[in-house]
UniProtKB/Swiss-Prot annotation:
Gene3D superfamilies: M75 peptidase, HXXE motif. It is found in: Cell membrane. NCBIfam families: EfeO. Residues 1-17 form the signal peptide. Keywords: Cell membrane, Lipoprotein, Membrane, Palmitate, Signal. GO terms for cellular component: plasma membrane. It comes from Staphylococcus aureus (strain MSSA476). A lipid is attached at C18 (N-palmitoyl cysteine). It is a lipid-anchor. InterPro entries: EfeM/EfeO_iron_uptake, Imelysin-like, Imelysin-like_EfeO/Algp7, Imelysin_sf, Iron_uptake_EfeM/EfeO. It comes from the Bacteria. The lineage of its organism: Bacteria, Bacillati, Bacillota, Bacilli, Bacillales. It holds the Pfam family Peptidase_M75. Its main location: membrane. This is Efem/EfeO family lipoprotein.
Length: 284
């Protein structure tokens, strides 16, 4: 009987040991899988960091040309550069939170500054936009504002390498930006003097889509249907924007966009934002 008991105990321990080995193997597989996802997220974030660096580099180059046009009193050249240069900044806007105080210095609207009772501190592209498109003049104040803009653009460019960009910021930033496009930018409030809003919209969509493209391989492993839904909605938004392309590779004035199309665009961006907000599943 003692031998039988000993034999049964040995068998139980052997089975338990085998079970523990299987559990360890499963844990090991899960750990390796998690490590793989973390590595992919890190790689995608690094790639977006590089993309942001490139956009801010081009933004600085464009701003230098823009400021030179202001210094030369070249109104036509300044207006031609204005929307195109701003696109580099707008593509980076999903992570503008990381820009700190430089974001309002470069991109604040007068309405926002008035709301905060800081209109005397107003600076940046939109202040110069008002001078070019509403006041229709370049004076000493405009030139001073242009020099300050260039200084801020240089500071942002220098800061690019130290920006704290994370997957969470990228994902949340892209969703928040699309929400802003659909609810407030769609009214024309961003480019209230120049009506070059469609350039901004296109750049905002491109910035958000870059984030999706970089995370797409990870998302497809987690939820292929969600990934396909996001891609389909990006395509719909871009098709609506394409309707208002001009013959020079740019976009028509936002004033030419019908109320029907404005609503269609807002609805399309909202429809895109809904599945895009679920993309955080890749970090789980």
């Amino acid at each position: 009987m003692k031998k039988l008991t000993t034999l049964l105990l040995a068998s139980t321990l052997l089975i338990a040991a085998c079970g523990n080995d299987d559990s360890k193997k499963d844990d090991s597989k899960t750990s390796k899988k998690d490590d793989g996802v973390k590595a992919e997220l890190k790689q995608a974030t690094k790639a977006y960091d590089k993309y942001t660096d490139e956009q801010l580099n081009e933004f600085l180059k464009g701003t230098e040309k823009f400021v030179k046009a202001i210094e030369n009193n070249d109104m036509a050249q300044a207006k031609a550069l204005y929307p195109k240069v701003r696109m580099y900044y707008e593509r980076s806007e999903p992570v503008a939170e990381a820009f700190g105080d430089l974001d309002p210095k470069i991109d604040a609207r007068l309405a926002d500054m008035k709301e905060e009772k800081k209109e005397k501190e107003w600076s940046g592209y939109h202040k110069i936009e008002k001078a070019l498109y509403e006041d229709k003049k370049i004076d000493d104040v405009t030139k001073k504002d242009a020099q300050q803009l260039l200084k801020d653009a240089k500071e942002l460019h220098a800061k690019a390498d130290t920006l704290d960009i994370t997957p969470k910021l990228m994902l949340q930033g892209s969703v928040d930006l699309l929400n802003e496009v659909a609810t407030s930018k769609i009214t024309g409030e961003e480019e209230i003097y120049s009506h070059t809003d469609l350039y901004d919209f296109k750049a905002n969509i491109e910035g958000a889509q870059k984030i999706y493209d970089l995370f797409k391989p990870i998302l497809e492993k987690k939820d292929k249907k969600l990934s396909d839904d996001i891609q389909m909605n990006f395509d719909k938004v871009n098709q609506l924007l394409d309707k208002y392309k001009d013959n020079n590779g740019g976009y028509e004035s936002f004033e030419k966009v019908s109320k029907k199309d404005r609503k269609a665009f807002a609805d399309a961006v909202n429809a895109l934002g809904e599945p895009l907000s679920k993309m955080a599943v890749i970090t789980e």
